[in-house]
Amino acid sequence: MSDTGGPLSIDRPDVDREFRVDAPFDPAGDQPEAIEQLASGYRQGMDRQTLLGVTGSGKTNTVSWVVEEIQQPTLVIAHNKTLAAQLYEEFRELFPDNAVEYFVSYYDYYQPEAYVEQTDTFIDKDASINDEIDRLRHSATRSLLTRDDVIVVASVSAIYGLGDPRNYIDMSLSLEVGQEIERDELLGQLVDLNYERNDVDFTQGTFRVRGDTLEIYPMYARYALRVEFWGDEIDRMLKVDPLEGEVKSEEPAALLHPAEHYSIPEQRLQRAIDEIEKLLDQRISYFERQGNHVAAQRIEERTTFDIEMMQETGYCSGIENYSVHLSDRETGEAPYTLLDYFPDDFLTVVDESHQTLPQIRGQFEGDKSRKESLVENGFRLPTAFDNRPLTFEEFEEKTDQTLYVSATPGDYERDHSDQVVEQIVRPTHLVDPAVEIASATGQVEDLLERIDDRVDRDERVLVTTLTKRMAEDLTEYLEESGVNVAYMHDETDTLERHELIRSLRLGDIDVLVGINLLREGLDIPEVSLVAILDADQEGFLRSETTLVQTMGRAARNVNGEVVLYADERSNAMQSAIQETQRRRRIQQQYNEDHGFEPTTIEKEVGETNLPGSKTETGGISSDGASDADEATRQIEQLEERMQEAADNLEFELAADIRDRIRELREEFDLDGGDDSDGVPAPGPEF
């Protein structure tokens, strides 16, 4: 894992530190052959490969062993924060001696600035920044610039604009014991690095002064650096716990990076301001020629204010909109992103590529359409367009070697890969579920019989419907029939989701009904039956990819079965069934040849297969408190769970718990203190 909590000295070791997987088991099933094929492919010069791995085949472990084989810095891109956090935890466990970092959007809440011409309404940018995720982003870029053994797990934030890495390097501040430097000179240099002086609230990105002692809290670190002066000489440097004040170690040297990714040297800043002022004059003239004096005044006031802030502090709110001026780029060129912090040779792993690639492809156009209105109405200069995500073509150009990972890779991955490596046989020797087609006529009554059979065997059932109304009606019908059933819908928050999954695993409920049950966290060993209603209806929820993914929910149980309710066999059904049967035959033949007997995966009920799965979400009553005392007791329990969730990087879960705490405090008029507004940051172990 990352050692940014370790010594603050330059991180690059004298001897290259190799990637080394520390797993409690060896590759098994199809893993050894897949690892060899993929590693050999990259050594032979293949740029793009696909790992087609069925659910439960250990794709993450295979990727880890490939990284160990090819020894290259690696970027892993997931399609949402939750999945990214899950992968981050897994890679941290597999690479305990290497730098495993996490890079996602640092906004708990984000409303980008926008202008609605029809109603002449300007919506200002509104955001809530998660300080801990901000720290992790800085930790990621620092690791990439100071060491070679780095794995960064990211969301699509990886393709959004970031500061010029050359500025980030050039502005680094090196300190050594015995170095002659005036204390006030060092304070000025810290301000240039966008650190703020705060002698009271000592947080990341700040420093404080006490006589001849200076304490700096790096933006990316878990510990602070105490610098003790003797006259104009650095006498001693210590790494200290900022909360406890405990000295962790004595440091001979330290390397400090800027507190902002958009930090810029003074000379470059002045050149940027000159460019901005020149463009501003041109834009004012443009609006005046159009007779749009409101827009002319608006762009002048807003831009002038930003310029004054940059001149005074080297920074302004929304500085990213001037990023093209702050770097040596021309308008229209690709922005600097996280990818530019990687060396020339690195591996990009696109996880769940069938979902992640379309997401990457769609980012550019969505950003452009929003900014067009802002620029045309005088809220931003035209160079705001250059603060953007990469186009898909730019993303491909910036990535060196790529590995697409999915149980159902799309046509793009197949067409653009030098080879597709299949991982069909699971290390657990479980086979894909048997598939049966049943008539849609009388499907509810038939389903009820199947549910009764599974309940008698102490097994669980997942049911997926096409519409919200149908899911609600089915849930009500099953309840009236005496079934312990719950309904998971799109408004189910993360905390409720954890509770539902845990209840299903414990047997408090036997059936879970939903519309789209593909989200991560539903690989539940107790589920032996997946029922897909109206399976022959064409559409996204009944496409070949979705059907194969949904069928895979029953692949963790030795008795796994899938029933498709349909009156006709659609093309998607036919393809999905054929693929599942093909995989099942391969798995059964392998088990027969090697004498393996599959068994259901055993997993502690406290886990939910979500990031930080050691967090137990049960035990907190979701019922309303009857009085203030009970509310206080519930809040104490919730606060403990909120901290646990944040420690495990389950930020969405922590935010949901925070919202429940707020509701209880408001309902009973309880004092929330100063820390009720934010999700707590993970503790030192992080």
From Swiss-Prot:
Protein name: UvrABC system protein B
NCBIfam families: PRK05298.1, uvrb
GO molecular function: ATP binding; ATP hydrolysis activity; DNA binding; excinuclease ABC activity
GO cellular component, one term: cytoplasm
Residues reported in the UniProt entry to bind ATP: G53, V54, T55, G56, S57, G58, K59, T60
Domain Helicase C-terminal: residue ranges: 443-606
Family the UniProt entry places it in: Belongs to the UvrB family.
SUPFAM superfamilies per the UniProt record, alphabetical: C-terminal UvrC-binding domain of UvrB (SSF46600), P-loop containing nucleoside triphosphate hydrolases (SSF52540)
Chain intervals for the UniProt region annotation (Disordered): 607-631, 666-686
Beta-hairpin (motif): residue ranges: 106-129
Top-level taxon of the source organism: Archaea
Key words, A-Z: ATP-binding, Cytoplasm, DNA damage, DNA excision, DNA repair, Excision nuclease, Nucleotide-binding, SOS response
Localization per Swiss-Prot or TrEMBL: Cytoplasm
Keyword Nucleotide-binding: yes
UVR domain residues: 632-667
Biased composition range(s): Acidic residues: 668-677
Entry domain remark: The beta-hairpin motif is involved in DNA binding.
